[in-house]
Amino acid sequence: WSRKKNDPVIPDNLIKYAEDNWGEPDEVYFYEDYTLKNERRKFAGQFPQTIQFKYHIRYCDHHLSHARYGYWTSPFVDCTVLVVDAIGEWDTLTQWKVFDGEFIKQKSWTYPKSIGLFYSAMTQAAGWKPNEEEYILMGASAVKKHKIENYNIVKEMWNNDVNFHTGININFDKFEIASIAQEIYEEEFKKIIDEIEDDNLVFVGGCALNVSANRFLTMFNTFIPCNPGDGGSAIGCVIDKKIPANAYLGYEIPGEYPVTEIIQELKQNHMVGVAKGRAEFGPRALGNRSFFADPSLL
């Protein structure tokens, strides 16, 4: 809406669009408890944050909002929900058992222990933007094999519960950093899922976007929603019944898909942007908002 990627500000035109289409809300739900979050920020030596909005705001526990979104859009009645991200208020990993809509927390990791914060710190150490370009780190992890001595340095930091929220001071090649980060993440991820005793698993949180590590989930009937990160949590705040999983929740642009025109443009070695129908909801959206090009020209 603002044409700024990951804009932290809610754009005025988005609010107006919602009001024009659905009316003014009685209250607004937000996917973090700011009282608890500011307690954690104070503990970490950070300044508190506030939200200013013209409507009354009700707060929801962050990891519960993740879990609710994943469960209610899944095909399961009874299942385990695993939430792994950088950080919520205090939780960085939670595991829930859900029986017919009743959520029971089984385990949790709390700040500063966080495999998500570790991965973000490694993203920053490699020269990419933390909390945004972790997908680049994941892709880069396959480029180069790391040296075992450098792996041991980072692994020791993880084993000694280093607080990665402040970053990590290493000077390895960025592709080696990526390789080390992915290997340690996958080692810890396998330990986590090996302790799950269930056939049905819902996996949510920002770490659910690490599609390379998700190959270890084939032992379960696994459901990962289209937007497992904080965007999905906005739905998780308010949802309380099963709805069909559907990624087409964004702004609608009418018109037919211009297949013939796209083909002609590609034949002329052009790059083509296509916007048609409702935009997909989630960071891995592809289809109704796409760029096309002939990769043989690269």
Task: Name every feature range the model reports, one short phrase each.
Residues 1-298:
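Short acidic/glycine-rich loops and adjacent helix/strand connectors
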